[in-house]
Amino acid sequence: MRKRISAIIMTLFMVLVSCNSGGVAEDPQSKFLKSAIDLGNDFLNVFTSFGDIVSKVLGFSTETKKSDVGAYFKTIQDTIQGTKDKLNKIVTDMKREGNPNASATETAVKTLIDNTLDKIIEGSKTVSDAIGDASDPIANVGANNAAGVAGTGIESLTKGIKAIVDVVLGKEGNAEAGTDKKAEDLSARTAAGNGEAGKLFAANAGDDANAKKVAADAAKAVGAVTGADILQAMVKNGANAAADAAKANAKDGTIAGAIALTVMAKGGKFAGPTADSADYVTVAKGAAVSAITKALDTLTIAIRKTIDAGLKTVKEAMKINANDTPISPEQNTPKATTNN
């Protein structure tokens, strides 16, 4: 019996060897189907990278530095650049081997790169460069009697964010979302009046009692809008964001956008109270972290969805199953949660 089993195993081995040593060249189409599979794995790595990026964003805290936000955009830049390089290599290999789908694939890749990838890469670089190595915290509240500071590089931040938002969000989101009602009594906001979020950007936030109301109003504004609303407000108001947030009848979206820009800007800082107010500082910092987390979580997911759609078009041009996507934008992506 043992000899018989050994003979069967030897026969199977010889068959396998003969099948794999026939000297037959690999079929070009099979080779590129393999390339397509490899590309699919590359796509999976890209999407996994975006999941990691979102995880980092959701890990932002009052101790997070502005340079960490800059690093987020640098990671976006590098990740998209890697995708661009892989796509260009696929096209080069297809053309060299005379693949019949090379021309259509080249067109699809060029469209994706020109209309989407390059714009995200450039926008991310602009934002990252504007923030640089700023070591101050994102939730930066001034000392007692310190005025709010918009920070530097606002125009560059706005330019870079706009380049990305225009591609991945389009018109989604409303820069003037929410209401103009302040948290204290739901009356309309005045021009940075006492107890209003506009005081974050003023000469000071007021005494302890009023400063607490300022922080509560800021938290109300951020909580009332979406990440897309915040991004659109940042893009729309730009260098005027802080001033617009301090105007009468300022909407929640306007205030939240100004908070997010101040969080990102080098040297950006919220006004301090006129006297010690630990509660004001804590709640104001929380609103700042919430604003930037909402904005960047939304931005990352929108980038993923946009690139996923573009890669599907490339797969269609390569004549492979465009619906056989490694993972979808909604899969394996941490979502921000709120406690009711």
Swiss-Prot record:
Entry membrane topology: Lipid-anchor
Pfam families: Lipoprotein_2
Swiss-Prot/TrEMBL keywords: Cell outer membrane, Lipoprotein, Membrane, Palmitate, Plasmid, Signal
Source superkingdom: Bacteria
Key word Secreted present: no
Lipidation (N-palmitoyl cysteine): 19
Similarity field: Belongs to the variable large protein (Vlp) family. Gamma subfamily.
Function according to Swiss-Prot or TrEMBL: The Vlp and Vsp proteins are antigenically distinct proteins, only one vlp or vsp gene is transcriptionally active at any one time. Switching between these genes is a mechanism of host immune response evasion.
UniProt protein name: Variable large protein 5
Taxonomic source organism: Borrelia hermsii
Gene that encodes the chain: vlp5
Subcellular localization(s) per the UniProt record: Cell outer membrane
